[in-house]
Amino acid sequence: HMRDESKLPQVRFGTWVGGDRDGHPGVTAEVTAETLERLRANAFVVLRKQLVALSEKLSLSQWMQPLPQSLITAREKVAEALGERARAVLSTNTSEPWRQYVELLIERVPIEIVPHQVSQLRTGIGSYEIAEELAKDLASLRDSLTEVGAQRLADSDVRPVIRAVQVFGFHLAQLDIRQNSVFHAKALSQLMDAAGLDGSQWEEWAENERLRFLEKELRSPRPFLHASASAGPEADTVLGCYRVLAAHIARHGADGIGALIISMTRRLSDLLVVYVLAREAGLTRSLPEGLVCMLPVVPLFETLDDLEAAPSILGAFLEEPMTRRSLDFLSWNWGREKLPITQQVMVGYSDSNKDSGIFASQWGLQKAQARLAQLGRNAGVRIRFFHGRGGTVSRGAGPTHRFLEALPNNSLSGDIRLTEQGETIAQKFGHFVTATYNLELLLAGVAATTIEHERSVPMAPPLAPVLERLSRASQQAYRRLLDTEDFITFYRQATPIDALEHSRIGSRPSRRTGKPSLADLRAIPWVFSWIQSRFYVPGWFGAGSGLKALTEAELAEIGDQLRTWPFLYYVLTNIEASIASTDLELMNAYADMVEDPALRERFMKIILDEWNLTREMLEKLRGASMAERRPRMLRTLKLRADALRVLHLQEIHLLKKWRGLRKAGDEAAAEAMLPDLLLSINAIASGLRTTG
């Protein structure tokens, strides 16, 4: 089995750089088209490089090795496909047939490499169209080497290239397309208006009215408008993107495109709207049974309320005739093989944390995944969870093996999708050894957890009523802080959020719509600003109050479960790590920037009281202090403390000066010193090894 590539664990890469337009006006249809082309070109660059390296190793001579008929046949077949292009290759390396064969394969790769220039896609007679063609030609090479006894060459040199073709295909990474449900609603409203159907009040329609209209529309393949017609800015934006996807599928197949992800999925109609928009752009097919969508439609549940509603929304979605047809169509993998019927569901860790606090967020995610997995089993559909984790504890980060162990029972069935943030990519995959380690950790962890889940019986989590009460009390404490009058003033003055809003380090604007409200602020700058000021509020606040709300007997039960329930261990260990990363001296130094002393004292008392309570309750629960139990972690933090303190104090000095210039109306001077301020932010982020 180990020599059969199809039996090895499968790993695939995805991206939404160039595909994620949720709140990012710069990601246009043209950007998506260019992204798909660049991904395809770079896949060919990677594969060509591997083929060139392979050809250099295959110096077997036909005078020393018998030439198998299988290689002669394979070489003739490739040469015939290339036509005249094969002539130059066949005139070289005439006594090294294996090398010559690989040179023919290189000629079939449709990429033009020009030194010191961007590689260009090229088309020509005999060029590869699909990755399976290259994989098949490489399999012929491997088999011919095995035939002449060169098994080691086949295993050590050819198999890794076959594996690269399996992993990267001709697309390098699948591009996901993400857009907000509100944007889709506006697009549909404009389409309806343009078609004379009066969609101006679409967002005011009751849900049952929406569903009646959408289900009726999806029984017909007829679009609203001619392809050349314009319906409005949102409609044109969505349809422009979808038409790029449809054109790419028509030319190259769907391997390079992931899913249509709908952020802020709040109701069933948010998903069905996407089917109607896909029909308008030619992203559907009309089969005898009815319309099918050529790409998966994936809900993204982000807030605590949305996670609560997720099972009922997904259950209704899976009952929709178009959903069932589309899932069955996609399960045939474009005619290659029959795969299990699978519905992908994305769960977000950031917004639920920002709205409700760390414990309520984690418990809400745990419950939602368990219920969604059970719903899938009842419907005969495999649920593939896509975990939108960030680079910090408050946004779902943590040790990979602990994260996998903490997943709800029976929620992992052999495959999983995870996001990796920009700052963690360099840390985890910047070097060959660490990249290998982290990928192996993920593959082994998924395999082990899947086996564990298959052996276990689905059951309610232990202590569910106790954790429900803990979660509710922690959420109330967290919301009390955020809802306290003048909190936004304290937050904006005690953290560098205003400087972060002027930076260009994120992939999207810091606010969804530009409104200066807490609700409109994205989770990443929210977390980043608290980390920079060493409060780490999103990573621990509310946990102490939640634990304090329990009885002594309930606390003792939680203490016992810590040893046997990975979820509880994972969450409380991460909260403890956040508490350890705070710095009281620096918290006070940042708070000193708050102009109103009474306001400063009021909020610092709330935060420090909860900080002390959380430490106290964690020590009580664990039966020992952090210094006794986790000396290595504290030693690691201490090693960086002095250097970081200098950087923090410099940042505070620069922030005060920058804010003073802006307050005085000297925008030119403020703009001139912004690079120094952003440099200090970057230095602190590097020292802490995290942003948001």
Predicted regions, residues:
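Often metal-dependent polyanion-binding catalytic scaffolds in large enzymes
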Residues: 1-215, 232-234, 258, 295, ...
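Conserved structured core elements
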Residues: 7-10, 41, 128, 132-135, ...
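Catalytic or ion-translocation cores adjacent to nucleophile or general acid/base/metal-coordination motifs
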Residues: 27-58, 281-476
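Active-site cores of enzymes that catalyze phosphoryl transfer or operate on phosphate-rich substrates
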Residues: 97, 110, 174-175, 180-272, ...
